[in-house]
């Protein structure tokens, strides 16, 4: 896909990145420094030591501020005096609504990378409150959801009629810097019944059901993915009218981690059901997350080495930090059945997630998005302008298939 790379962004602004010292949040800060070098960036995080290390590394107009995501007054305080805030504190089923409510109370424009379907529903329900506060809030603007949604919109705008939109992703589980929120999200998406959109209505289906091999761009290529709980089927039908089917399927690599997740889900070990161990009560999912975080210390070195070798042989330089995305938009154009496919293979899942959030925030702060309220990305972002900017750092491959006249 060839995009004209001419989109001017105003860079003299003040931006707060909540969770800006974290795995994804630090990527957002880096993207802002690269794309808007004159902007003032505030890293709001509970871990000020790591925040200061990031400031020392990047320099520029970056400052730090302590924030407690469980304290609404603390959240409001750091968001009060900025042009826009970016939420990178997860998991979003815990923090999505809390942080968005604080942004509304602070009357500050807002973008986040909310990737949990239930949090997405709850945040969209705050639309009128955000509208009354006079702010623009865009939720779920990462890689998936986010870039997937914008690609779905872009493809849909090229069709006369849209019938089906299929989104998929494959993510590394080998990144040594991956935080607990990402693991908790994957477990959340992989358990119980999750929403999808079929025959023009929302229905519940089993997570990790209906395996399908999706052909991502090389070197990722064919990877088996499964139904997961994600925002795309929740939001896309709200904005792309007439679509009858919207799906999201995903997985992680190496394959052993996918198989382990299936077993955990079947045994109920990644649910939010609470249990007590040695007098301490907690959701069983918290234990599973800590277990996964401890794999490097618990698993024999030869097993870790074998998994790394397997992934490197299969995915090459994408093995450790990569991600793959695929979007298919099916419908009708000039009375012909047409399918547009978009594929992304990115060496860095952090970049692929952080860059869309940074660009979206810059667009809102620069006045490129006028609507007030809470929206998913496809609801308010101009797909062509956005993808022109994405193309500077992330390659998107487009294919078109046409059948005979109807």
Give, region by region, the residue ranges found by the protein language model.
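Conserved Rossmann-fold cofactor-binding substructure of NAD(P)-dependent oxidoreductases
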Residues: 67-82, 88-91
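ADP-ribose/adenylate-binding Rossmann-like module
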Residues: 91, 102-120
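Helix N-cap at the beta1-alpha1 junction of Rossmann-like dinucleotide-binding domains, i.e.
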Residues: 47-49, 117
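N-terminal Rossmann NAD(P)H-binding glycine-rich loop of SDR-like oxidoreductase domains
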Residues: 16-31
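Rossmann-fold NAD(P)-binding glycine/threonine-rich loop
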Residues: 114-135
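Conserved glycine-rich Rossmann-like NAD(P)H-binding loop of the short-chain dehydrogenase/reductase
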Residues: 37-47
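C-terminal catalytic/substrate-binding lobe primarily of soluble NAD(P)-dependent oxidoreductases
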Residues: 158-406
């Amino acid at each position: 896909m060839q995009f004209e790379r001419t989109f001017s962004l105003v860079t003299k602004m003040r931006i707060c990145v909540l969770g800006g010292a974290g795995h994804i949040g630090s990527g957002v800060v880096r993207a802002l420094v690269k794309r808007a070098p004159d902007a003032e960036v505030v890293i709001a995080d509970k871990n000020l030591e790591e925040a200061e290390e990031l400031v020392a590394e990047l320099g520029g107009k970056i400052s730090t501020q302590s924030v407690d995501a469980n304290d609404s007054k603390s959240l409001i305080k750091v968001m009060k005096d900025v042009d826009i805030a970016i939420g990178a504190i997860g998991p979003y089923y815990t923090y999505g609504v809390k942080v968005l409510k604080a942004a509304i109370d602070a009357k500050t424009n807002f973008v986040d990378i909310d990737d949990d379907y239930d949090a997405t529903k709850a945040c969209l329900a705050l639309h009128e409150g955000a509208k009354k506060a006079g702010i623009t809030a865009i939720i779920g603007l990462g890689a998936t959801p986010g870039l997937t949604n914008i690609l779905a919109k872009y493809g849909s705008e090229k069709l006369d009629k849209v019938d089906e939109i299929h989104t998929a992703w494959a993510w590394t589980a080998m990144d040594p810097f991956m935080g607990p929120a990402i693991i908790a999200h994957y477990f959340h998406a992989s358990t119980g019944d999750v929403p999808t959109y079929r025959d023009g209505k929302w229905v519940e289906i089993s997570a990790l059901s209906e395996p399908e091999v999706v052909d991502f761009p090389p070197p990722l290529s064919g990877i088996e993915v499964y139904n997961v709980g994600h925002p795309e089927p929740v939001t896309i039908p709200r904005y792309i009218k007439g679509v009858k089917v919207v799906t999201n399927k995903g997985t992680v690599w190496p394959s052993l981690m996918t198989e382990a997740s299936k077993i955990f889900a079947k045994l109920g070990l990644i649910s939010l059901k609470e249990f007590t161990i040695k007098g301490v009560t907690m959701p069983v999912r918290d234990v599973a997350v800590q277990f996964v975080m401890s794999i490097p210390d618990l698993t024999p070195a030869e097993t870790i080495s074998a998994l790394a070798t397997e992934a490197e042989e299969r995915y090459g330089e994408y093995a450790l930090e990569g991600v793959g995305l695929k979007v298919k938009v099916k419908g009708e154009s000039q009375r012909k059945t047409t399918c547009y496919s978009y594929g992304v293979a990115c060496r860095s899942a952090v970049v692929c997630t952080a860059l869309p959030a940074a660009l979206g925030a810059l667009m809102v702060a620069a006045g490129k998005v006028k609507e007030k309220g809470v929206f998913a990305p496809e609801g308010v972002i101009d797909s062509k302008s956005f993808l022109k900017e994405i193309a500077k750092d992330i390659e998107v491959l487009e294919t078109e298939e046409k059948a005979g006249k109807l």
